[in-house]
């Protein structure tokens, strides 16, 4: 609590636009400030800077309420390319499931895809906050690469996703499964892996039958 208060407080050496920053921080809930404080290892100044960056980003078309009401995001969601599953994984984490064959880089609108991604992460985290103490704090992402071809390879979106992991949702995604990536995915992964840095360790490439181990025994997710 003290760290959150320090983040909200104005500093004597603050620049002239500090009042704008203070107004932004005043609009942020305590849980958000506390999360960035933990991410920055209790360094209030670094956490404050990262939180302000996050809040400014939210103002650029990624506001939670704005995404919920967006007809464009709803149209993108209707494609079924990415969904928040109704079931959790074996660790009770929410799961965002992406079917790559439903995503064509030639016809997609990047902004819509990015905004759908954020909306699904928001929905997962909102679920967890509603469950109170003892609930998981992270989610899993599953990318189903069965049938993947190069027309499904979207490096620009991947760069956005990685930026989200680092800057906007740090330590919120604790597992990424790549389901049966074909050989044509290899050069894509060679580009993506270095961009992920330490987060590359979260990624596991698995067969569909082995992915079942990450879910409850009764799950039928990978039976098809």
Regions from the PLM with identified roles:
Residues 1-224:
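Basic, amphipathic alpha-helical/coil surface patches used to engage anionic, phosphate-bearing ligands
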């Amino acid at each position: 609590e003290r760290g959150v208060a320090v983040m909200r407080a104005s500093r004597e050496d603050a620049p002239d636009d500090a009042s704008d920053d203070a107004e932004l921080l005043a609009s942020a809930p305590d849980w958000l400030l506390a999360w960035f404080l933990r991410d920055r290892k209790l360094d209030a100044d670094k956490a404050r800077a990262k939180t302000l960056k996050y809040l400014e980003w939210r103002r650029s078309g990624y506001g939670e309420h704005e995404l919920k009401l967006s007809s464009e995001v709803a149209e993108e969601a209707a494609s079924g390319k990415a969904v928040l599953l109704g079931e959790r994984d074996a660790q009770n984490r929410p799961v965002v499931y992406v079917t790559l064959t439903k995503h064509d880089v030639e016809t997609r609108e990047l902004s819509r895809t990015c905004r759908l991604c954020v909306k699904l992460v928001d929905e997962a985290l909102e679920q967890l906050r509603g469950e109170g103490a003892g609930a998981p704090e992270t989610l899993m992402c599953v990318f189903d690469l069965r049938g993947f071809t190069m027309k499904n390879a979207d490096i620009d979106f991947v760069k956005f996703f990685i930026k989200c992991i680092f800057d906007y949702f740090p330590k919120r995604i604790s597992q990424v499964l790549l389901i049966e990536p074909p050989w044509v995915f290899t050069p894509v992964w060679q580009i993506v892996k270095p961009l992920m840095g330490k987060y590359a360790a979260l990624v596991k490439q698995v067969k569909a039958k082995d992915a079942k181990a990450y879910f409850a025994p009764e799950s039928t997710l990978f039976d098809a």
